[in-house]
Amino acid sequence: MPHVLAVLDRTHDPANVEKAITMARSAGFASISVDLIYGTPGESLDDWRDTVSAALALDIDHISAYALIVETGTKLAAQIKRGELATPNDDLMADMYLMVDQMCEDRGLSWYELSNWAKPGHSCIHNTAYMQGRNWWGLGPGAHSHVDGKRFWNVKHPTTYKQKLFAGDSPILDSEQLTAEQSKDEAILLGIRMRQGLEIALLQPHQLEVLSEYRHNGFVEINEDRVLLTPTGRLIADRIVREITI
């Protein structure tokens, strides 16, 4: 929606999106995805329905939908602090999430990760590798990579990145070697976000006790070897993860 894009200070409009997708199809790309943000100040549930409908009408193969995060130091954060814009409403964002989930499912795009839906055979390879803790490379300014338990990231500024490459230097800014405990916590954090769920083998008895309470309240399902989020459980996935990894 144009007024939503204006609040987010975006320079494109819906017509640009349609044009870009048409060009991508013409260029031969077999999988095309659209990224959406919901919960923008001033965005109604009807606005969001129209946005998702417009995206699905383009016959795309994949949708990513993310709740708006107001980052400190941004223009949007300053506008909210001054009272010019309202703080995103959590209940409305929950309704928006459930709406995009249902609309995607109705059009044959099934969720495979909390924020991602795809037609059969069109799940994002990078997203899946990241969520499953496999090796992956990130190219470009600020990009992160993960190889054999080591995480590293590049300098953020494009000019600095370019200068290092032209000088024959590595653009890597810093790195860290994940401990066994960190790797396990990340496997829990990321695994529970996936449709196939979290392996019970990764959990300790006290963690299963916490999850049993969530099962009692209808937020998770626990079968022989996996923990699965229910639709309402997906709305509080971050809270569940915090409670089982502290």
Predicted regions and their residues:
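Short, amphipathic alpha-helical interaction segments positioned at domain boundaries
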Residues: 232-246
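Short amphipathic alpha-helical interaction segments
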Residues: 202-217
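A short, conserved structural fragment
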Residues: 215-225
